Amino acid sequence: MLRRLVGSEMCIRDSAHIGSQIFELEPHEDLGEIMVKVILDAKKFGHNIKELNVGGGLGIKYTTNDDPPSIDEWVKTISNSVVKACKKHNLDLPKLMCEPGRSIVSTAGITIYKIGAFKEIPGIRTYLSVDGGMSDNPRPITYQSNYSACLVKNPFNINSKNKYTIAGKHCESGDVLFKEIELANCETGDLICVFGTGAYNNSMSSNYNRIPRPAALLVCNGEAEIIQKRESPIDLLKYDVLPDRFIK
């Protein structure tokens, strides 16, 4: 690729993507060294790369079992790696950029579900259903992703001795948001708050089984405004067209 770009002025930046939800710092340290080596290789073909975009990949704490590094630790690791490698090879420091997505926006969002029915299978588990599921959050069924949650009326999960499997409303055996999550005693109509849904949930949402998307609200300093209206059944049908040949 570098050879094919000889004579081009477009080769000024090297961009990378090494993965997602990464909890270790070593891969990012290695990335800094590798990207500086790309600068060296590019120089052999007359290119002067002045910018390095290390992408993102920093994980977040979805559950108590997750232990990601801080953003400060991540930035320090990458920048130190690039500085060290540039010094070793006598290179000018490039402009260093990153694309932190999930690590910033995920914890800025929560999802609220309302509890509907309960189903207890004695000696096995207790199911509770909510008014959402895989259409607004496909990540559990797609990636086996885990989240933290609490009852809105009991945000600190005091006396959380009950285990529930929380299922969605989509008539799918895989439409399960939580398996055996510990919560305080729940009742029909209670609200469940799921944390860390600010990234991917909205962008990956769908109208599977003709389920309308929920509304989105912006909450700041005690005020809340709708920033995405709740969809209605009419919204789901307005783009459907019946061909004239079927109309008698």
Regions found by a protein language model. Give the residues of each.
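Glycine-rich tight-turn/loop motif centered on a GG-T
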Residues: 24-28, 63-73
